[in-house]
Amino acid sequence: MELPEPELIRQSWREVSRSPLEHGTVLFARLFDLEPDLLPLFQYNCRQFSSPEDCLSSPEFLDHIRKVMLVIDAAVTNVEDLSSLEEYLAGLGRKHRAVGVKLSSFSTVGESLLYMLEKCLGPAFTPATRAAWSQLYGAVVQAMSRGWGGE
């Protein structure tokens, strides 16, 4: 597997990581726009959210956003040695499968990630940066997908 362009990823992530909760909220708002059927998967204390806005303002869901952004941060930190995260990512895959997330939904998450990066970076989100992030995200999903196969 060819590694993504590490410096493009690190440079762009520096900007995003200044406000991870804000940018993570953009990512999830886009995700719920593209795939509203995911909303019912997010329940905390048996509470079902009535709208994406309700979910996105929940303290429990904001914690989930923080965790997702930390996983992305770990991938950026280890961009040149993603194999060091393989077991962790496979475990995340198992957790997502257990709560009913379909592997196919990670394609929509990827689209939402690219959307968030474009909104955050503006003109600095070049085609090369997009390609690097697509490659990194693809490698992360490949590792997480091992959790669906029970490996």
UniProtKB/Swiss-Prot annotation:
Documented EC number(s): 1.7.-.-
Sites where the protein binds heme b: H64, H96
Catalysed reactions, semicolon-separated: Fe(III)-heme b-[protein] + nitric oxide + H2O = Fe(II)-heme b-[protein] + nitrite + 2 H(+)
Any GO MF annotation of the entry: oxygen binding
Alphabetized UniProt keyword annotations: Cytoplasm, Disulfide bond, Heme, Iron, Metal-binding, Mitochondrion, Oxidoreductase
Globin domain ranges (all copies): 1-149
Disulfide bonds: none
Post-translational modification note: Phosphorylated during hypoxia by ERK1/ERK2. Phosphorylation regulates the heme pocket hexacoordination preventing the association of His-64 with the heme metal center. Thereby, promotes the access of dioxygen and nitrite to the heme and stimulates the nitrite reductase activity. Phosphorylation during hypoxia is stabilized by 14-3-3 proteins.
GO CC annotation: cytosol; mitochondrial matrix
GO biological process terms held by the UniProt record: cellular response to hypoxia; oxygen transport; response to hypoxia
SUPFAM superfamilies assigned: Globin-like
Main location, first listed in the record: cytoplasm
Pfam family, one: Globin
Compartmental location: Cytoplasm, Cytosol; Mitochondrion matrix
Transmembrane residue ranges: none
InterPro entries named among the record's database cross-references: Globin, Globin-like_OT, Globin-like_sf, Globin/Proto
Self-association and partners: Monomer. Homodimer and homotetramer; disulfide-linked. Mainly monomeric but also detected as part of homodimers and homotetramers. Interacts with 14-3-3 proteins; regulates the phosphorylation of NGB. Could interact (ferrous form) with G-alpha(i) proteins (GTP-bound form).
PANTHER family membership: BLR2807 PROTEIN, NEUROGLOBIN
Family, as annotated: Belongs to the globin family.
Job description of the protein: Monomeric globin with a bis-histidyl six-coordinate heme-iron atom through which it can bind dioxygen, carbon monoxide and nitric oxide. Could help transport oxygen and increase its availability to the metabolically active neuronal tissues, though its low quantity in tissues as well as its high affinity for dioxygen, which may limit its oxygen-releasing ability, argue against it. The ferrous/deoxygenated form exhibits a nitrite reductase activity and it could produce nitric oxide which in turn inhibits cellular respiration in response to hypoxia.
Protein's name in the database: Neuroglobin
Natural source organism: Bos taurus
Gene name tied to this protein: NGB
